[in-house]
Amino acid sequence: MTSFTDLVKARRSANKFDPSVTISPQELDDMFNLVKFAPSAFNLQHAHYVPVIDQTKKEQVHEAAFKQYKVLTSSAVIAVLGDLEAYHNVGPINEGLLSLGVIDQREFEETVSSVTDMYE
């Protein structure tokens, strides 16, 4: 398994892509199924990812993205959307911890209250 340090050192930003390289919908699905395991603030899973591989749709994204040329040559464009209402799920998300006794009623109520206050 690759270490975190190796991953960070190997990562590069790309601005030029080979338009002949494609990525399949299955490969994208596999990647995004793994992303679901990544932690998020308060476990709310705010981010939603929408892959765009259709050339016509990529042209629309190209226009919306200030005509960045890399949008047209990339295998896929990933639109990252944030759920501004995700905090409404803090109660149901934490009910499992409450029912298992990981947190008590006071901690549950404080968590729901503080997360809600932070977002409203």
Residue ranges and their predicted role:
Residues 1-120:
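Acidic, surface-exposed loops and disordered segments
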